[in-house]
């Protein structure tokens, strides 16, 4: 049962190893510089986050409507001269699609290494500015953050398996009906070849504007 898995804290550097050996159903989508264990104080300088800009589409209206929305979002990214093959795309296994854009596509390495305060709010702002139907805005939470389903475990039954699966941008564009979606989700696929990330200046500007706007709001609210 997904809900019975206990909260555990691991080093961000061990993420890949934990996914391979422990096979958790969920992990936090962002790394954080605080364990949130009872009795521990927040780090001096506040909470800092690191991780991809993430998006989650989900609908009860059927996968065709969701796929149209995702393709619209992909076209928006391409209008920013972003190569969508640099993003990681997933079928959630239940009428949904996940997208992760590597932080290296819009931030300098030294900033990524140091961590960024309120990173989830900058991602939320970007999602709001470019929202398409069925994009879930509830996933942008702080502190422990969003629990992100992994590709490790079957969320269906033995006779009717349903996995979250990795998929390429080109494959995603070819899904035209629910049967194609379900067929792809029957077999585990943990990763696909992704184009190495390169810095996209338009994405960088948009995320930085979102971060600056949030800092301004925090300063105004503190007065």
Predicted features and spans:
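Signature for HUH/AEP ssDNA processing cores
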Residues: 1-95, 101-129, 215-216, 220
């Amino acid at each position: 049962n997904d809900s019975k898995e206990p909260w555990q804290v691991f080093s961000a550097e061990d993420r890949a190893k934990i996914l391979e050996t422990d096979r958790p159903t969920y992990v936090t989508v962002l790394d954080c510089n605080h364990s949130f264990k009872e009795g521990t104080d927040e780090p001096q300088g506040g909470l800092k986050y690191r991780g991809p800009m993430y998006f989650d589409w989900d609908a009860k209206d059927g996968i065709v409507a969701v796929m149209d929305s995702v393709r619209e979002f992909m076209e928006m990214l391409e209008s920013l001269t972003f190569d969508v093959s640099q993003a990681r795309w997933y079928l959630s296994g239940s009428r949904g699609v996940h997208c992760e854009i590597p932080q290296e596509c819009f931030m300098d390495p030294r900033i990524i290494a140091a961590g960024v305060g309120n990173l989830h709010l900058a991602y939320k702002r970007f999602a709001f500015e470019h929202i398409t139907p069925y994009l879930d805005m509830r996933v942008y939470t702080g502190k422990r953050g969003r629990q992100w389903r992994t590709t490790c475990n079957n969320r269906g039954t033995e006779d009717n398996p349903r996995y979250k699966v990795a998929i390429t941008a080109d494959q995603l564009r070819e899904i035209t009906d629910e049967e194609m979606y379900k067929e792809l989700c029957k077999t585990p696929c943990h990763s696909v070849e992704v184009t190495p990330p390169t810095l996209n200046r338009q994405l960088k500007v948009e995320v930085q504007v979102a971060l600056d706007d949030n800092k301004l709001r925090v300063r105004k609210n503190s007065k």
